[in-house]
Regions:
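Gly/Pro/Ser/Thr-rich low-complexity, intrinsically disordered segments predominantly at protein N-termini
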Residues: 1-189
Length: 189
């Protein structure tokens, strides 16, 4: 029987009793190998996306940045703070104003959130985050699904009843939207 390989402790979370708080999470050492998000005292830890995932994030955020009106700002992997002890790191965001500072940005400052889903994050992205983003009043939620031969994207807009409504869907790997501003996003396979 072989001895277990040595575990690199820099990638392990410290022992912690009770629910996690926002302060607990923000005091963790920086770790570029994984995402650590917080919902109601529980941590969601996931690896960074694959190369295909990162290409989709880059192309979507690059297209949004190119079309973005000057008063808005496009970012990637930003700590977005929601009511209570909730912290998500969306793949990309469009902020309502330029020049965000600090370790976190309040959800009230976010116009659009984009997520590229994967097998390990699908339920969180499509169910949990959708609900939290809607409750926080984030106007637009762009979901990109790379799981098909041709990636698919869906843009949701927050409706009057506080629920997201689909307003655009990609065709043949291309998403064209008019709101929150006109842009065409080509989704690489």
């Amino acid at each position: 029987m072989a001895a277990p390989a040595e575990i690199k402790t820099e990638y392990l979370l410290p022992n912690h009793e009770g629910p996690w708080t926002l302060d607990d999470v923000l005091s963790l050492p920086e770790d570029n190998s994984q995402r650590i998000e917080l919902v109601d005292g529980m941590l969601y830890v996931s690896p960074l996306g694959t190369a295909a995932h990162q290409r989709l994030v880059f192309e979507a955020s690059y297209a949004l940045r190119g079309a973005c009106p000057k008063e808005f700002e496009t970012t990637i992997e930003l700590n977005v703070q929601f009511d209570g002890d909730r912290l998500f790191i969306p793949d990309f965001t469009v902020l309502k104003k330029r020049g965000a500072k600090g370790l976190t940005v309040p959800a009230a400052d976010v116009l659009l959130i984009g997520e590229v889903i994967s097998r390990s994050t699908k339920v969180k992205d499509v169910v949990v985050k959708r609900q939290v983003y809607a409750e926080a009043g984030v106007s637009y939620y762009l979901i990109i699904d790379p799981a098909k031969d041709v990636p698919k994207a869906t843009l949701l807009e927050l409706g009057e009843e506080g629920k997201y409504v689909e307003i655009a869907r990609s065709e043949n790997g291309v998403l064209t939207i008019e709101r929150p501003f006109p842009v065409t996003i080509e989704l690489p396979s």
